[in-house]
Amino acid sequence: MATASDQNLREILEYDTIAVVGCSTTPGKAAHDIPKYLIDQGYDVVPVNPYADEIFDRVAYDSLLDVPDEVDLVDVFRPSEEVPGIVDEVLERHDQRGDVEALWLQFGIRDDDATQRAADAGIQVVQDSCIKVEHQRLK
């Protein structure tokens, strides 16, 4: 899968609502601090974590499929071996609800086969890249 161009990244960063799969309740962890940064930048962040009821004073959902509102971008902070299941949920939302325009896998997270399925469905994909780093670089 090709690396996203700066123009593609800028387009993805224009989305408003970001579901963060693996969002953490623990300050100091990337899965907490990066979503907090995104909130501070004006994004509507939706935490997805089955072990938390609330993160950042927002409802935390058990799975991506439980999020009732429209989601533009899914940002993933889970191990690479969990990506195929996450992509299944992304594709189900995309097919049934017509949302999820982009999938972003954070540093160290990669699965070419699973993300190719998302790309084949017309979803923009970024792998092994930090959304905060790219936001700071491009915005």
Q: Model-found features: residue ranges?
A:
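Haloarchaeal acidic low-complexity proteome signature biased toward cell-envelope/secretome components but also
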Residues: M1-L13, K139
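Phosphate-coordination loops involved in phosphoryl transfer and adenosine-cofactor binding
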Residues: E14-Y15, V100
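Rossmann-fold NAD(P)-binding glycine/threonine-rich loop
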Residues: F107-L138
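Conserved beta-strand elements of the Class I
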Residues: A19-V21
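S-adenosyl-L-methionine-dependent methyltransferase catalytic core, i.e., the SAM/SAH-binding region
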Residues: T26, D33-Y43, R78, A121-Q124
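NAD(P)-binding Rossmann-fold cofactor-contacting core
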Residues: S24-G28, Y37-F56
